[in-house]
Amino acid sequence: MKLAAIHHVAIIVSNYEKARDFYVNKLGFAVVRENFRKERNDWKLDLSVGDGADAIELEIFAEPNPPERVNRPEACGLRHLAFRVDDVEATVAELAQMGIECEPIRLDSYTKKKMTFFFDPDGLPLELHE
């Protein structure tokens, strides 16, 4: 068996409007599909980032009253999402202008590249990595 690539990552959010604003208007994801699922009384938002073979989809499910993360970030399951950027420092500055705080920039001990973390509106850790 040979897997070609990761097609998408799915996350559950507690507030659809906040999550949509954060991922689309602040992080620059493109909306692929947006559907209200009447039978479940929730929203499913499919987003995309990257181009061509580097594109990946993020599926957002807005569930009513989801349980909070057990702890951060060390829990079974998804630990964090990491985004490749050309310039961590410039990206951190852009996020700061939008009121989004990042941890101090540090050097990844394995890749020797600059990296940092910040959090989405539900506290999901997000990484920036050069």
What are these regions (language model features)?
Residues 32-33, 42-43, 65-71, 104:
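A short, acidic/glycine-rich surface segment
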Residues 71-77, 81-89:
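Mid-chain, well-packed structural core segment of small domains
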Residues 5, 41-43, 77, 112:
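Exposed loop/turn and edge beta-strand positions of beta-sandwich/beta-sheet ligand-binding modules
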Residues 1-2, 46, 92-130:
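Vicinal oxygen chelate
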Residues 1-18, 78-81:
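N-terminal beta-strand motif that seeds the catalytic metal site of vicinal oxygen chelate
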Residues 10-12, 48, 82-84, 129:
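Short hydrophobic/aromatic beta-strand micro-patches
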Residues 12-55, 97:
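Core segments of cupin and vicinal oxygen chelate
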